[in-house]
């Protein structure tokens, strides 16, 4: 998963933004600190960014800043879980979860019809995986259990959910701040899903 | 947060408290607070120590205060000496004494008339710096306005408008001049509009760059305009 990097100068050119804007977004935490990668070059130290991620983020900021204030944007990108609560019906109405997946989730989780953010995330992840046909219901239960067991971690860090199969037996794991994962050749990687992206997707659907 | 009905914590003379929620906290004399406090107004006039975090609407330090934790307040005024081991979050920060922060400073407006030392990054919308400062990380502000009275240092400076001016010295100032270096030392300066005097930097990048007297700049990279004073040394300047 080694990424292509882009230097700050090229980024400004490519995205058509100024230093002032870039630093302002950094101050507002719209661009995470980890993306500022310092490397020494022949002119001294230079800052680089993961190219794909930063361009996508800047694109998002630029299209959304017309409607939203920078602070509202910052809330959206921040991994901190908002103290949001929603009802089961609301989630279905807003197309975050389909009724079928919601019923499956509620069969396995009996803590009521009011959803706070961690539960919304769980059900959203299930929805994504089940609807795309990548996992079956049994695997869904397994994913749910991993997400529930590690809920405190998911809150703070950028996590990635990885599901893999070998000889028809599936397993799943949660990666925290990892660079790369490698499997032996008989293993099939079913899906790797960034929970951070999921959170952003949910938030953009809610707004 | 409802602090209206909370009591006050006032320590006159030598005393200690275990912290908690208050309306008004005043440490006169030698006061120690052993854990976190949350209050509407915090004031320290003598020598105070807080061993936890402080959350307040206004915080005023006129004496000598030391904080083992973080300060989070709308308005922070330092007229004496304040030592903060972790971070300082303040909407408005005014320093006319000496403030040293071990972690980072996050603010909207920083007005500095004294000495400010920051271990990590310093972020603000407006940074007005007079006298002296040392910033271990990045000084990131929309408007950076520096008037040099002494030796200032920052690892990097970034923002939209960056102005560094030499203070027009008084008579006494010129007498003692050989003992004090009035200059700003930094690795990088990046901004849209940059105007510098008495600055030593390795790299300056910007759209409109104006290099004034007594500058030593390694490389200037500009996109629109560039001008250089005859008393400035610029290693290389290129339009990109």
Predicted regions and their residues:
Chain B
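Extended beta-solenoid/beta-helix repeat architectures
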Residues: 1-240
